[in-house]
Curated annotation (Swiss-Prot):
It comes from the Eukaryota. One of its GO terms (cellular component) is extracellular region. This is Antibacterial factor-related peptide 2. Expressed in the pharynx (at protein level). Detected in pharyngeal neurons and secretory cells. Residues 82-85 form a propeptide. Gene3D superfamilies: Antibacterial factor-related peptide (3.30.30.110). It comes from Caenorhabditis elegans. GO terms for biological process: defense response to fungus; defense response to Gram-negative bacterium; defense response to Gram-positive bacterium; killing of cells of another organism.
Length: 85
């Protein structure tokens, strides 16, 4: 148990020290991953009941910005996705 806790603490310290960004738009500047980042942002906004979203630079950091939240975009139909899989 102690070893597992120590490992997790060291892993967390490494991630913080490396300044790794785990946001949905973190890889929006990589040409191949740009479309994937955009898709993840739209999905994230949809889960927040917004119509759409896009990756923007805010204060020099990639950020997912959601739009049309007042109108809502509904949820992703998880039931339909589960039935397909």
């Amino acid at each position: 148990m102690f070893v597992r806790s120590l490992f997790l603490a060291l892993l967390l310290a490494t991630i913080v020290a490396a300044d790794i960004d785990f946001s949905t738009c973190a890889r929006m500047d990589v040409p191949i991953l740009k479309k994937a980042a955009q898709g993840l942002c739209i999905t994230s906004c949809s889960m927040q009941n917004c119509g759409t979203g896009s990756c923007k630079k805010r204060s020099g950091r990639p950020t997912c910005v959601c739009y049309r939240c007042a109108n809502g975009g509904g949820d992703i139909p998880l039931g339909a996705l589960i039935k397909r899989g």
